[in-house]
């Protein structure tokens, strides 16, 4: 799975949790908080993405990411090492 596909999985789940963002032009620099995701929304998005990618990683490993591009990068690295 390539980085672009992981980014697409991330966007799909963001739009499912935050349907008001459907049609938004997502950029790697976008931050979930700035997009309107509260802590519960962010946890739900992460859980859904991890399930879609069949990953089991501690959430703490994702806590340092600053934007959705960095999140996709970390997830890509985890998929490659799984």
UniProtKB/Swiss-Prot annotation:
Residues carrying O-(pantetheine 4'-phosphoryl)serine: 39
Pathway(s) of this molecule: Antibiotic biosynthesis; bacillaene biosynthesis
Gene3D superfamilies in UniProt: ACP-like (1.10.1200.10)
Reported modifications of this chain: 4'-phosphopantetheine is transferred from CoA to a specific serine of apo-ACP by sfp.
GO biological process, one term: lipid A biosynthetic process
Domain Carrier span(s) in chain numbering: 4-79
Keywords on record: Antibiotic biosynthesis, Cytoplasm, Phosphopantetheine, Phosphoprotein
GO MF, one annotated term: acyl binding
Subcellular location: Cytoplasm
InterPro entries, per the entry: ACP-like_sf, PP-bd_ACP
Any one Pfam family match given in the protein's UniProt record, by short name: PP-binding
Domain of life: Bacteria
GO (cellular component) term, any one: membrane
Cited function: Involved in some intermediate steps for the synthesis of the antibiotic polyketide bacillaene which is involved in secondary metabolism.
Protein name: Polyketide biosynthesis acyl-carrier-protein AcpK
Species this protein is from: Bacillus subtilis (strain 168)
Gene responsible for this protein: acpK
